[in-house]
């Protein structure tokens, strides 16, 4: 797992007092510990465990997950990735992004996928790499304000499985919702 930033760095290098004022958290709540917690959540889900998913960190604001092709092949003789694995990895990347951000913001929430639309563009013959982020710039801030005010919120997410060339093999567009843990 690659961890590139501390929480303060992740929050745009705000002065320490600004981070602690805007994010109720403990000093031990770093991006590294939040990413490790997310990996443990994935390991605790038997279907996800069988996919061999690894959290690869935040890259340009997007959560990156990886999974080996060998654990996610379909029934075809040419052994390309199973479409269900592509859908699962993109859904988990989107769910994971929102879960991670809520944890970093000091909230313990249950996150659910409300709906999603998938598009399969090309077969995948290599290890799977998914990136997920909000569909609209600034939507995280609006989501967080709504969550704090109403105790629930939804956000549009987009995810992509990229080929080694960088071209999209599959895309997901979906809405995810969060409620406080009970």
Predicted regions and their residues:
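A short mixed-secondary-structure module that forms the rim of ligand-binding clefts
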Residues: 72-98
